[in-house]
């Protein structure tokens, strides 16, 4: 089980750095990373993006809000939802439905793009990661109420947790045809770092004050580049070298197309992350649907104040972990475990004003294919290329995580480009007196710098002034 705890700690460290692509940038003029949404998109110039400064970002997508967990108490302090002054009914009103939490890490380590006639090429190295959780509503009732009412039965089925971290090297190619079609492909070589997945199909808990009767059916798998190291105790160095010579590899592809239906109307579509990683060493735990008795333990935390919040939640999570009974299981060691990536589909439609092409309206539909963690979003965007080197975007989105307002600005003259944007301002629009965000934890903030180079090949080239006719030469001609 040391393997599980080490990988879990690694996954949690990734969670604190999590971020996601800036979907507000899909229609943003001059945004260098549009090709990551659709490989058919071509940059207005070539660019170089260096480590650290090329993108600093953080965020999460969730149906939860901080106010669902922290409540004011009679002492004037904030208490968790476990506090005795917080009623069961109030907690269930806020946390009684299925909860989704998705975070994505997309850390560009190095990126490069350049143009060659009608083609555009990109090459980048990045670290990718996903942390996803789907929790049944009864899980919070279990944590809040427990067996305080005497006998209680909880249905914790369809609980799903997953995390994948991998390194990626990608090459992208886009070609323009007939001055109206752009077709693109992006090839990705992947190397797995860590993967942890838990899928509980059935979990029923019957509780009383003395013991819990648990019945569970599900599985958990753990894969990591550290898997061999943690199992080898005699010669760690040789184990490490052997593992590095035989890494967990994978392959993925992005496909995209963009079509100018009319002069002022563009349709685009793409499929991103179509592929998988093959893990060479995995530990798979299977829970049989046989009932067992779990004695649990008592928690003395009062739920008041923010200093002991971590202790309270850790204690409750320890109780939940005990329900899975993984400690008593012998894992099945699998040498080949192929896991698909979470695939994403984008469909966009952009309309420009005939009398002012610098102003456009865009519709973007996004769907994430990821099993129980799948989600869908529709986003309406207004985009303004105020100058050839300065652009703005504002948008409104509706998704499985609720509704949100986003915006971005992009300063992109030749030689230097800086961008700042967010897909949702909502968490920053409402705060408690303790400066706790009250709205849904559904946001991201992206800031970065890169260095454009080469001839401008964007939508707004400089107009060539016609030379004035020489009046004298005209008279001589007459």
What function would you assign to each model-found segment?
Residues 1-23:
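Bacterial Sec-dependent N-terminal signal peptides
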Residues 20-478:
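Subset of outer-membrane beta-barrel
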